[in-house]
Amino acid sequence: MEQAPEDQGPQREPYNEWTLELLEELKNEAVRHFPRPWLHGLGQYIYNTYGDTWEGVEAIIRILQQLLFIHFRIGCQHSRIGITPQRRVRDGPGRP
């Protein structure tokens, strides 16, 4: 009969502690790439939908991860993960 392998990895921190740390890291990254009023609106939407619950925390983590992934994939100027390998050229003279 099959048995699940024993947990032989390092001790993990509690789920809620890890989740809050992940949310904090995502928020810090999101404010570098998206307008604060827009992020505030997203936070208000999540709060109005889920209230102050773990379900709301999980929802905002999921949404921020998706938004950041798409943002980087499309080609964030701060990232090396974009679709096109060449830099985008702007019209007009370059900066001195």
Curated annotation (Swiss-Prot):
PTM info: Phosphorylated on several residues by host. These phosphorylations regulate VPR activity for the nuclear import of the HIV-1 pre-integration complex.
Keywords, ordered alphabetically: Activator, AIDS, Apoptosis, Cell cycle, Host G2/M cell cycle arrest by virus, Host nucleus, Host-virus interaction, Ion channel, Ion transport, Modulation of host cell cycle by virus, Phosphoprotein, Transcription, Transcription regulation, Transport, Viral penetration into host nucleus, Virion, Virus entry into host cell
GO cellular component: host cell; host cell nucleus; host extracellular space; virion component
Top-level taxon in the UniProt lineage: Viruses
Predominant location category: virion
PTM sites of type Phosphoserine: S79
Coiled coil: none
Short name of one Pfam family: VPR
Biological processes per GO annotation: DNA-templated transcription; monoatomic ion transmembrane transport; protein homooligomerization; regulation of DNA-templated transcription; symbiont entry into host cell; symbiont-mediated activation of host apoptosis; symbiont-mediated arrest of host cell cycle during G2/M transition; viral penetration into host nucleus
Region Homooligomerization: start-end pairs: 1-42
InterPro entries membership: RetroV_VpR/X
Subcellular location field: Virion; Host nucleus; Host extracellular space
UniProt cross-references to HAMAP family, sorted A to Z: HIV_VPR
UniProt record similarity statement: Belongs to the HIV-1 VPR protein family.
Function: During virus replication, may deplete host UNG protein, and incude G2-M cell cycle arrest. Acts by targeting specific host proteins for degradation by the 26S proteasome, through association with the cellular CUL4A-DDB1 E3 ligase complex by direct interaction with host VPRPB/DCAF-1. Cell cycle arrest reportedly occurs within hours of infection and is not blocked by antiviral agents, suggesting that it is initiated by the VPR carried into the virion. Additionally, VPR induces apoptosis in a cell cycle dependent manner suggesting that these two effects are mechanistically linked.
Further facts: HIV-1 lineages are divided in three main groups, M (for Major), O (for Outlier), and N (for New, or Non-M, Non-O). The vast majority of strains found worldwide belong to the group M. Group O seems to be endemic to and largely confined to Cameroon and neighboring countries in West Central Africa, where these viruses represent a small minority of HIV-1 strains. The group N is represented by a limited number of isolates from Cameroonian persons. The group M is further subdivided in 9 clades or subtypes (A to D, F to H, J and K).
Subunit relationships: Homooligomer, may form homodimer. Interacts with p6-gag region of the Pr55 Gag precursor protein through a (Leu-X-X)4 motif near the C-terminus of the P6gag protein. Interacts with host UNG. May interact with host RAD23A/HHR23A. Interacts with host VPRBP/DCAF1, leading to hijack the CUL4A-RBX1-DDB1-DCAF1/VPRBP complex, mediating ubiquitination of host proteins such as TERT and ZGPAT and arrest of the cell cycle in G2 phase.
Protein name, as recorded: Protein Vpr
UniProt gene name: vpr
